[in-house]
A protein has these predicted regions:
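Vicinal oxygen chelate
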Residues: 3-7, 11-20, 60-81, 87-167
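Core segments of cupin and vicinal oxygen chelate
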Residues: 18-71, 120
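A generic structural micro-feature
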Residues: 7, 53-58, 96-98, 141-143
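A cross-kingdom feature marking solvent-exposed beta-strand/loop segments within repeated
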Residues: 45-49, 84-91, 132-141, 145
Length: 167
């Protein structure tokens, strides 16, 4: 609101996903969701590894976002030859969220097209598309018809797609 002090952080620069296979993740985030590859680079050695608590590693970094964006990126970070080995998280339940789990939420006006692409690639869904109506607008979200579907990416990260139609 007007006159409020500025936050000491933000906006979000990126969300980093530690992925097993950047190419498998690109097949979803780039090829189906349509995000642009803003940067794709490889770095290696103890200096970069120590930044993430390792002794040595190779790292592929792929930053994705809407074309020309400087914030709100998704970073796909693939570690290889890591010393010590990268830890593995337990697989979350297939039908509901788990405490400590994060969800990436994206808006789209291409919901049906994206849903078809996800199904063709055999992704696992937490929920099928659900529609709900928000009768009254709030300061941050308009009234309208919302559609939401949640699926899991190749590393079991939940991704929510939200569509919107005005009342």
């Amino acid at each position: 609101h007007a006159g409020a002090e500025m936050s000491s952080v933000g906006p979000i620069k990126r969300v980093t996903l530690w992925v097993r296979d950047a190419d498998a993740s690109l097949a979803i985030y780039r090829d189906v969701l349509g995000l642009e590859v803003l940067e794709d680079k490889r770095i290696a050695g103890p200096m970069i590894a120590q930044m993430v608590g390792l002794q040595d590693a190779k790292l592929r970094i792929v930053h994705l976002g809407p074309k020309g964006s400087t914030h709100g990126w998704i970073g796909l970070y693939e570690l290889s030859e890591a010393k010590p080995a990268v830890a593995t998280l337990a697989t979350p339940p297939p039908d509901r969220p788990a405490y400590g789990q994060a969800t990436i939420v994206l808006t789209t006006d291409r919901g049906s097209e994206i849903l078809q692409g996800l199904r063709e690639r055999g992704v696992r869904f937490m929920t099928t598309p659900r529609e709900y109506t928000k009768e009254a607008a709030s300061d941050v979200m308009p009234a309208g018809h919302y559609t939401e579907v949640i699926f899991f990416d190749p590393d079991n990260v939940p991704v929510s797609l939200i569509g919107f139609r005005a009342l």
